[in-house]
């Protein structure tokens, strides 16, 4: 009897843990928000799942990861505790959206992230973000 109970509990635990997988957001805004939050929380492994898998995007992602990780622990904590402020959402067409955002830690710094729909899924296209940064400098 104890063995059957143990097996039942063990099987339930396995099924429950399999259902805890994080699902890829299905809307442009949700992908942008999840990506930004993962970056703020220094969760690059999860953030990279939202990036459009292209060489240039991967290079930009690695560059921003190195820059962000070079910050002090205190500053990383401030970013982690920050909330996202969505300043503007521009739907350019049915497969491209640009989200202008800042965060509660650095309200005065506004950034943009472009999300594109590829094969029915939304992804972050960092080429737009880095082009914006280069145009400012």
What spans do the regions from the language model cover?
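Exposed beta-sheet edge and beta->alpha loop/turn motif
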Residues: 76-78, 83-137
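A generic structural signal for short
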Residues: 23-24, 101
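Sec-dependent signal peptide recognition
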Residues: 2-9
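C-terminal motif of bacterial Sec signal peptides marking the signal peptidase cleavage site
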Residues: 14-17
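Bacterial signal peptide processing site
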Residues: 19-21
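Short solvent-exposed beta->alpha transition segments
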Residues: 24, 29-30, 34, 44-92
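Residue-level detector of alpha-helical recognition elements and their boundaries
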Residues: 11, 50, 62-63, 130, ...
